[in-house]
Amino acid sequence: MRILFAGTPSCAVPALNLIAREFDLCGVLTNPPAPAGRNKKMQDSDTALAVKELIKEGVLPENFPILTPQKLDDNYRKELEALKSELLVCFAYGKIFGPKTMALFPLGGINIHPSLLPRWRGPAPVPAAILAGDKLTGITIQTLAQKTDCGSILGQLEIPLNDSETTESLLADCADKCCPLLRDVLSDFENKLKQARPQEEAKALYCSMLKKEDGLIDWSKPAEEIERKIRAFTPWPGCFTFKNSEKISIIEANLYEDASNEMTKNKKFGTILGTDKKCGILIQTGNGILAVSVLQKQAKKKLEWKDFLNGSPDFLEGGFET
């Protein structure tokens, strides 16, 4: 079974490595080089870099095809057709495949999705699970369908959550844990396809693409909700607020349980209440107190709260804009 793998970010790399080492990988489809870092130098995708490493190791041949089309057009489809792929395996590629592309794969396509479908269909399932305070998420391998994330389920793996995960850590966990599930599906693909079950439409929930402006903190929200948002938006788009019109990124924070009634009495949300030497800078929210432990000024380094205050001694006066 000749497999074409489509993926772009680092979370796709473990699945790529598995297929390259244990199955018949005939090509890789990934996004073209893009500007990265402070200098905005053009850089290959994490998936493309991983393929080049596999070539260096001798796992893949020197002339192994890496396709990086800007558009999924007729020219790219000719390149695909030449590979004679039978199955498409996709994880976080970043583009949607139309019927003309899918017609090139006799066995169709499958997608690795980091949620327990039909919960959290869409482009940001990991942040969505953290934002919602889910206690359980997981990985789904589904058939590729015309409607996004609506394919039949070939396999699922549950991952319990403990209210400490960030999107970065949870996505990395999903990337590693998907490999045994993917091996199981690909090793017995014909039978898995026969046993595939449709999703329960009544249980479907959708998440939308995150935007930079979504990271603005609304201090009128409960502390619990803001804390989840900070974890869900790590590393991107990040959470931020403003103080005296200066943008301040909130990198890490925790719920603060030791507040006295006197401390919070008649305090408006967004007010900086002071500090706790073990927890950080204390912020009044719409319900409860948030202890901020790592902050960052624009174009500056991330700092632990004590170091941050050493460079900004007046920071504790007043509060954040709401």
UniProtKB/Swiss-Prot annotation:
Reaction(s) catalysed (UniProt annotation): L-methionyl-tRNA(fMet) + (6R)-10-formyltetrahydrofolate = N-formyl-L-methionyl-tRNA(fMet) + (6S)-5,6,7,8-tetrahydrofolate + H(+)
GO cellular component labels: cytosol
Matching InterPro entries: Fmt, Formyl_trans_C, Formyl_trans_C_sf, Formyl_transf_N, Formyl_transf_N_sf, Formyl_transferase-like_C_sf, Met-tRNA-FMT_C, Met-tRNA-FMT_N
Signal peptide extent: none
Enzyme Commission number(s) of this protein: 2.1.2.9
Molecular function via GO: methionyl-tRNA formyltransferase activity
Transmembrane segments: none
Protein residues bound to (6S)-5,6,7,8-tetrahydrofolate: 115-118
Keywords: Protein biosynthesis, Transferase
HAMAP family referenced in this protein's UniProt entry, alphabetically: Formyl_trans
Family recorded in the similarity comment: Belongs to the Fmt family.
Task performed by this protein: Attaches a formyl group to the free amino group of methionyl-tRNA(fMet). The formyl group appears to play a dual role in the initiator identity of N-formylmethionyl-tRNA by promoting its recognition by IF2 and preventing the misappropriation of this tRNA by the elongation apparatus.
Entries under PANTHER family matching the protein: METHIONYL-TRNA FORMYLTRANSFERASE (PTHR11138), METHIONYL-TRNA FORMYLTRANSFERASE, MITOCHONDRIAL (PTHR11138:SF5)
Name the record gives this protein: Methionyl-tRNA formyltransferase
Organism of provenance: Treponema denticola (strain ATCC 35405 / DSM 14222 / CIP 103919 / JCM 8153 / KCTC 15104)
